[in-house]
Regions:
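Internal mixed beta-strand/loop scaffold within catalytic domains of large alpha/beta enzymes
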Residues: 1-21
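CBM-like, beta-strand-rich accessory domains located in the C-terminal region of large
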Residues: 15, 20-185
C-alpha cells in the first residue's frame, strides 16, 4: 500500500466477510485472495501462486536509504518460466520509484503490472495515470511500452464497502511485447 499524508492511495483491499468458502479449498476463487487483485505483476500471463512454498527471496531493506527489494520469482509457479524478478521500491520525499528487473527462461506472454486504488482515476496523457483520493493527488508515470486499462470492482461486501466505498479500481499496465529480459520503471 502507498499512503500520502496518511491517506491510502494504492491499497490492499483486505479480506471480505468470513464465510465457509474463506476457510475451505475454494478460498483462492475469492477475488480478494488472488494475487491479480494485489499490487503485483502477472508474469508471462501467470499470477503469483498461493501456498507457503511460494515466497520472495533475497529481500533487502534499508530504512535509512528508504529502499526495499525482493526477488519474487519463487512466488510464482513453474509455468511462469521466471528465472529472476527483482521488484525494488525507492522512496524519497516526493515520489516512490518502483523498478522491476527480470529474466525469464522463456517469454510466452506479455507481462502486466496491477495496482489497486479506491480513488478517482484518470488518464491525462499517454504514460500517466492520475489518482485523486480525499484531496490527495498522485501521478503514476509508466513506460511507453505499456497500455493502461481500468477495471471497476463493485464492492457488495459491507466489510469492504464500509472501508472503501461502493467500488474500487484495478489499474492494469499491459505491455504488448514478449521479452525474456528487461526492466520497468
Amino acid at each position: 500500500s502507498l499512503y500520502v499524508n496518511t491517506i491510502p492511495v494504492f491499497i490492499d483491499a483486505g479480506v471480505g466477510t468470513y464465510t465457509k468458502q474463506t476457510f475451505g479449498k475454494d478460498r483462492y476463487t475469492i477475488w480478494t485472495m488472488q494475487s491479480n487483485y494485489h499490487n503485483l505483476p502477472m508474469i508471462n500471463g501467470v499470477p503469483q501462486k498461493f501456498g507457503q512454498q511460494y515466497k520472495a527471496t533475497n529481500t533487502v531493506c534499508n530504512e535509512k536509504k528508504r529502499i526495499f527489494s525482493a526477488d519474487i520469482a519463487t512466488a510464482y509457479p513453474a509455468e511462469a518460466k521466471v528465472k529472476s524478478w527483482i521488484r525494488s521500491y525507492a522512496l524519497d520525499d516526493r515520489k516512490l520509484m518502483i523498478t522491476d528487473n527480470y529474466t525469464l527462461n522463456e517469454a510466452l506472454a506479455p507481462n502486466q503490472l496491477n495496482f489497486l486504488t479506491w480513488g478517482k482515476v484518470s488518464f491525462p496523457s499517454p504514460g500517466k495515470v492520475r489518482v485523486e483520493v480525499k484531496g490527495q493527488k498522485v501521478e503514476l508515470d509508466y513506460p511507453s511500452q505499456f497500455k493502461a486499462e481500468l477495471e471497476t470492482i463493485k464492492l457488495d461486501d459491507p466489510r469492504l464497502s464500509n472501508v472503501w466505498g461502493k467500488e474500487i479500481y484495478r489499474i492494469t499496465l499491459k505491455t504488448e511485447e514478449k521479452k525474456a529480459t528487461g526492466n520497468y520503471k
